[in-house]
Amino acid sequence: MDTVLFVSPTLYCCGDTKNWQSQVPKPGYVPILKSDIPKFEQSLKQANSHRDHDKGNSVASKTNETDNSDEFKTSTSRYVDLKSFLPISLEQQLHTVCLAHFPLGLGSKGIDKVMDRLDNLIRKKLQVEDNETKFIKQWSYVDCVNTLTVYISFQESIVEEYGKAIQLLEKLFDNGSDGIGLHMDENTRRFVCDLTEGSPAKELDETAKDEFSALITMLRSEPGSISQEKGLAGNSAVEYNVDISTLSDLPSSSLDQLCKDIVEFRTRVITLEKEKRNKELAEEEKRRKQNLKHIFDRIKVTNGGSEKGSAPEAESDSEDSDDEVEGYDDEDADDYEAEKKRVQAERDAQEAQYESMVHSFQDSLLVQYSSLRQEYQRLQNYETHLQKNKGPMLKELLHLAMDPYHDHHRPYKESESKADEEDRKRESEEVPKKKATETEPETELELELEPETETETKLVSDADATTAAPKIKLALKKSIGKTKNEIEEEETPETDAFQQKLNLLRESGVVEELVKEYLGVYEPDLVSYIFENIEEHQSKQALETELTETFDEDSPVLVSRIWEAMEQ
């Protein structure tokens, strides 16, 4: 069982690392397990380090405020994000310019100081008495990998001073102070020209440019710059805090060195990963530049490479042609040049048309190929798809039969079905009549022969064999014909109705669905066997007996459902 110790966090934070643990309870001490002491000690160390760091930051911020208060008196930041900066009205667009190739590493505070310096310069050169006047309203920027593009929006209230301020900025960034250049759109340039038309331009000495360059250089080296912030962020990103609770099985004397080794190992892994990533990015950038170079070379070859590549041939041809052209008159030479240009233009047009036709043909061929390939795959798997989806397709056909859009020529169909029913009834009534007419001659023959036989029996009593035989045969034929006609007359309507129900059952596909439902697999042989059994025996009990071996106790339910579907 783990022992319990008593610790005093207050003594530990005050620096008394010897007496902060006790084995007996004391006032101000809290109980804790011995195995949890390293983790608790680490949390106290982190709390002390954060407290010391906060104190150092507060002292440094106070000293920086006192040091920078005399040198720069910056107001609140005029930076806004790019979405809020976008000009809405035409007046805002005319009062917006940008500084391209602005150096990295200044930070938002540094760019604010640059904006204040530009305001001071404009007020000084335009001799504005009010020191609180601000020409620059707000600014924003776009990161362009190696440089920044800073967008500046001036106050709309200034009209006359705006043109002079833009002239001062153009002169300030004329020679490319630290690579910075002033850019504006055509409407803004025309607006500035209209404002400054007829007024003398303000001169700007070199000292102002030098001071501005020195300001940018100084701001880039300040501790609050973007480069140093990125460095601090990169260093803080690889700091690790090892969980001591996972190392509770190890002795406390070796925990510090083990934690240092773990942090060093993980930091090394992160560093190697960063170096690998930077190397991949550099290679990718190099590859991208190489691809762009190849693209530009290809464009040069397609546009003017043929002319450069065939320079020697062109020179030799030109020398030969010069000798011929010298013999022509001036008019012939002009006609020759015009004809040559016309032929070249036709050739270029034909080549362009040929290229467009080739591209269109390739596109159409690709589309046809893809469509034919899809059609081939569909036809190749048609039987499998049809066999696999036979049940859902039959259900879909049943649903489509009840669809209102399927109800085309419904009255004609109903009239035809009624006519078919009447034909079936008439046919069933005519068949027994035909059979009865076929048996009528036999009965007449019997009626004619019977009196003769009776007279013969009266006259000749001994002739029994010769006269009895035809009489018996005729009577048998008559009785057999009557029984057959009666049976056919009785069974014909019933068999026709049963056969009609069986056909409807066969067309509905109910038997297929039930077999697939109870078996889990569609068996066409079993379905055909069920129909043959129903047609042959016309008995529910016989079908149930035959299906008992296949469906076991489900056969009565299956047969009853089949019979219900057939009786509907």
Swiss-Prot record:
The keyword Nucleus applies. Keywords: Coiled coil, Cytoplasm, mRNA processing, mRNA splicing, Nucleus, Ribonucleoprotein, RNA-binding, Spliceosome. One of its GO terms (cellular component) is cytoplasm. InterPro entries: PWI_dom (IPR002483). Pfam families: PWI, SNU71_N, SNU71_RBD. Residues 314-335, 439-454 have a biased composition (Acidic residues). One of its GO terms (molecular function) is RNA binding. Residues 43-71, 299-335, 407-464 are annotated as: Disordered. This is U1 small nuclear ribonucleoprotein component SNU71. It comes from Kluyveromyces lactis (strain ATCC 8585 / CBS 2359 / DSM 70799 / NBRC 1267 / NRRL Y-1140 / WM37).
